[in-house]
Amino acid sequence: MLRTMLKSKIHRATVTQAYLHYVGSVTIDADLMGAADLLEGEQVTIVDINNGARLVTYAIAGERGTGVIGINGAAAHLVHPGDLVILISYGTMEDAEAHAYQPRIVFVDADNKPIDLGHDPGSVPLDISVAAELFDPRIGAR
């Protein structure tokens, strides 16, 4: 049996730009793509924390070290500069691999710089400034 599992997540990134007249995709700082194990052209789900919009597109690498998160094409109608987003990638794997697989979870600061790297999709790092705002599904509200 094949299972579709969380592969990568960049949590609470800030959208830095949006270009409506573009062929599509999301531009992600190449450093963030590396931290999250994302490849150019990989399918990515974007969840907008501000308005609840969800959409599927593909990743393209942006300039390293810039913190760029750019929404391109028609998605710019749904997701705007300043919005907080979660970028998610899924992978399909055999059952045995799914039981052992550890996803890449990247928490970022307000400038989209990685501040916590982990593998637990449900954990909330205690040492980041937004931790008090986040609900940990395993322990409840903080």
Swiss-Prot record:
Cell compartments where the protein resides: Cytoplasm
Function statement: Catalyzes the pyruvoyl-dependent decarboxylation of aspartate to produce beta-alanine.
Name assigned to this protein: Aspartate 1-decarboxylase
EC number: 4.1.1.11
Subunit field text: Heterooctamer of four alpha and four beta subunits.
Post-translational modification: Is synthesized initially as an inactive proenzyme, which is activated by self-cleavage at a specific serine bond to produce a beta-subunit with a hydroxyl group at its C-terminus and an alpha-subunit with a pyruvoyl group at its N-terminus.
Source species of the chain: Mycobacterium leprae (strain TN)
Residue numbers carrying Pyruvic acid (Ser): S25
